[in-house]
């Protein structure tokens, strides 16, 4: 069964101006099918995938380069109730705009002290916490040059395999937000604002990190926009 998808708040997977998104979206129309015991009772992802580190910034004196941030992300449903036990996967580039995976052709320098990805399990309040560095911007390898603003990728698994949200979190006040094809594929301004983290200017995180908060709404009409 396909969830409600408002085109104003949930953009299509193929984003104009970003050719790579064509390979991340079904080429054929989606098919609606009834929910069965298989869809509702499949193995829970968190039982198959163990939670990993919640620190991407390194340890001790060997810390990743860049602005240290402490991120608090809360997973909730459409009623605001916490989704305890949700499996949250996080990944982003380093401060120079370089990802750790081998397919990244950006010639920016790698950071040997930056881990690049984490896997966390939400607690009873739906909260996961992560220490990392603020990612950098990077140019998109496309027919025309444009830059991705700093952003963090999330994959949130629910209680079954077919319950998954893939999205991106952006930082407020970034000039490149205004020209980003991914963020601006969300046509509704209110929905677009739900993809922005909130800076907590009066708080100080561990090791003097900037503190950001973000809410991941996994379903419903107020769901966090799905982004590739």
Where are these regions (language model features)?
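Beta-strand-dominated extracellular/periplasmic modules and repeats
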Residues: 1-228
